[in-house]
A protein has these predicted regions:
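Short, conserved beta-strand edge motifs with alternating hydrophobic and charged residues
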Residues: 6, 30-33, 62-66
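Glycine-rich phosphate/diphosphate-binding loop of Rossmann-like nucleotide-binding domains
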Residues: 5-24
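A short beta-strand-loop structural module common to alpha/beta enzyme folds
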Residues: 28-40
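C-terminal binding/interaction regions
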Residues: 4-6, 10-11, 92-145
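Mid-chain, well-packed structural core segment of small domains
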Residues: 65, 70-108, 112
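Short active-site oxyanion
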Residues: 2-3, 59-62, 81-84
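Short, structured active-site "lid" loops
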Residues: 46-64
Length: 145
């Protein structure tokens, strides 16, 4: 699967770890940055190009990181056809529902909150869970205005 990935300085180390993990699993990873640590960088500079890339390729997904993942999801969701969901811990069912009911195509995670040892299971789950379709399709269509 083609996966776009992006972060600001807050998630740089975790992004690099996730990128290596995904590549080892055979995914094609497009890294939109950040590529070096700069505590003054701005997350929209990396997140928006990532979200645009996902919006242009319906078969791809995106993983974005930041301190909390909230601002990053807000930025990504400004792009038409993007449905970014935030996860920073808690029940795995939340991640499943983002795919089953919302067809989330970007997973936004809070690097300062999520435990690294749990992140790979969450990513694997999010990548494998299909969209249910059905009654959820009409709801998603109402979002792209």
């Amino acid at each position: 699967m083609k996966i776009h990935i992006a972060t600001d300085h807050a998630g740089l180390e975790l992004k690099n770890t996730i990128k290596q993990y995904l590549e080892k699993k055979g995914h094609q990873v497009h890294d939109h940055g950040a590529h070096h640590f700069d505590p003054l960088d701005d997350y929209p500079d990396f997140i928006v190009p990532c979200a645009i890339a996902v919006s242009l390729d319906s078969k791809s997904r995106g993983i974005i990181l930041g301190g909390s993942g909230q601002g990053e999801a807000i930025a990504a969701n400004r792009i038409k056809k993007v449905r970014a969901a935030v996860y920073y811990g808690g029940p795995e069912d939340i991640v499943k529902l983002t795919r089953e009911h919302n067809d989330a195509n970007i997973l936004s995670m809070g690097a300062r909150f999520i435990k690294e040892k749990a992140i790979f299971n969450i990513i694997d789950l999010w990548l494998k869970v299909p969209f249910e379709g059905g009654r959820h399709i009409q709801r998603i269509k109402k979002l792209d205005i």
